[in-house]
Design a protein with these regions (language model features):
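The feature captures the beta-strand-to-loop junction immediately N-terminal to the Walker
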Residues: 35-37
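Helix-to-loop junction immediately C-terminal to a conserved catalytic motif
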Residues: 50
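Conserved ABC transporter NBD signature motif
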Residues: 58-66, 75
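Catalytic Walker B motif of ABC-type/P-loop ATPase nucleotide-binding domains
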Residues: 161-165
């Protein structure tokens, strides 16, 4: 079972606690939503769970293992994420950005197989981003970038998908479509 859970997690910045004693558990097929006002620490919790921020206290488990005991390569095969921060993607097409989600499955040289490219194309189709896949990622709209970042996480093909404001920058039609796809993926 690929459950993700936290026990007595304390998150914050520069050794200053923001939120303490966070106890979450999400099992396969479940969707958990963190709700709160801007600046309340939702993104900080997600960044800490995904090891983008150092935890101040407590434990994050991926399955039965503490994430402290797992290598980054092990984590990236089991957990994917879409965060609100911008990737540095100089001179990359949308399709190349999505393809980077397959890197945990490639060898040392990062060469994708036909099967990898099929997963990339399937994820792009799922988020309806085919029209921008060949364009420079930095020259498309925020909403188009958001859809491609979701495709990147989907084609990473993990059991756990962590999304920080996944419908940011999207118009209403795409918001509904993305939320439907997220439900289907669960």
């Amino acid at each position: 079972m690929q459950e993700i859970r936290t026990e007595h997690l304390t998150v914050g910045y520069d050794k200053t606690p923001l939120i303490g004693d966070v106890n979450l558990s999400v099992r396969p097929g479940e969707i958990l939503t963190l709700i709160g006002p801007n600046g309340s620490g939702k993104s900080t919790i997600l960044k800490t769970i995904t090891k983008q921020l150092k935890k101040l206290d407590g434990t994050v488990f991926l399955g039965e293992a503490s994430m402290d005991e797992l290598k980054d390569s092990q984590i990236s095969r089991r957990l994917s994420m879409v965060m609100t921060e911008r990737l540095r993607t100089e001179l990359m097409s949308g399709r190349e950005v999505v393809a980077s989600g397959r890197y945990p499955y490639t060898g040392r040289f990062g060469i994708l197989s036909k099967e990898d490219w099929a997963k990339v194309d399937e994820a792009i189709a799922l988020v309806h981003a085919g029209e921008v896949q060949d364009q420079d990622f930095m020259k498309i709209s925020d909403g188009q970038r958001q859809r491609l970042m979701l495709a990147r996480a989907i084609c990473q093909d993990t059991k756990i998908l962590i999304l920080d404001e996944p419908t940011s920058y999207l118009d209403m039609g795409f918001k509904m479509d993305i939320l439907t796809n997220i439900r289907m993926l669960a």
